[in-house]
Amino acid sequence: CLRLVRDLEVDHGEVKYVILPTVTGVEHKYFAGPFAQRFKRSQVFVAPNQWSFPIDLPMSWLGFPAKRTHTLPADPRQTPFYDEFDYATVGPIELSVKPYTEVAFFHRETRSLLAVDTVLSIPVDPPEVVAQDPYPLMFHARNSAQDPLEDNPANRRKGWARIALFTFYFQPETLNVHPLKSILQNAVSSPNRSKKNYFGLYPFQWQQGWRKSFAMLRQDGQLLVAPILQTLIFNRGPEAVLAWVDRITQWDFQQIVPCHFSAPIAATPADFRRAFDFLQQPDPQSWSGFKHNLPKGDLSTLGQIDRQLRGSVPASPEDKSENG
């Protein structure tokens, strides 16, 4: 990553600003401070309402340079880069632990919306960066511990689809976990008991229907608000989120650059707004409070997490099908 940025500096000059536009994205916050340390003359701007878990530490303790780190002001015109970028902030949305805040940026020259985790598009094929090391794809493409690890296009797609289901649902309805005794017995008979292959341990038991589940999640590559955001975060502040969407759709962007999955995505403000339609479909029968264009069974684990966050008793497995 640093090498690629250094290559860009040759053509465009040194890095002037490092921006952390989220408060909850650990995969972003963890690297932002050390990244900023590598660019000694850059100014660092972070989203408001920053916090760390389990102990709320000062930003400087997380690697952010104390004298160069600033909070993004409410008015984008107060920033030194306003002539190039506008931005809009959502939050704080109160969660059970700490508040959620995210900032979306608009780059005027390229008419690009820079969206951290807000929306994304799921490809059929694994992204190039994932395919650089296909081992995890082969690992998850198997149906049992006895299956060989085979690298071919079909298995890469199969493994990618299952990893995507893991990522967004944690445990989709079509995934069961073997009992511990079966996991150990199957590991003994595995043809590959190497450390890299987790000593033959393979707890997953995929049921028929996982391909349909992936297709319904992917929605032909349309813009998608991740299920976790739909059901655990944005549903807790729908009015604030929709006001944020209104602000963003005033920008005349023609592509979206998210931090995950496919990028850039050809998309218009209307496409972006459509991804948030679920917030305009309240459903008192749904544990999230809204209708979602996703299988209810796949959302059941997120429903259990929601109950835990709210301090109530998790649903039993028998109740899963009723929690959509």
Kindly label every feature range from the protein language model.
Residues 1-3, 26-31, 51-55:
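Short, charged/polar "capping" segments at the starts of alpha-helices
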Residues 1-7, 103-107, 112-117:
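Conserved beta-strand hairpin/beta-sheet module of binuclear metal-dependent hydrolase folds
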Residues 15, 100-102, 110-111, 253:
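Short, surface-exposed beta-edge/turn micro-motifs
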Residues 16-23, 42-52:
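Short internal beta-strands
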Residues 47-103:
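Metallo-beta-lactamase
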Residues 19, 44-47, 113-118, 255-259:
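A structural signal for short, well-ordered beta-strand segments and their strand-loop junctions
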Residues 7-17, 23, 30-38, 123, ...:
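Cap/insert and terminal regions of metallo-dependent hydrolase folds
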Residues 56-58, 98-103, 114-119, 123-129:
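A short secondary-structure junction signal
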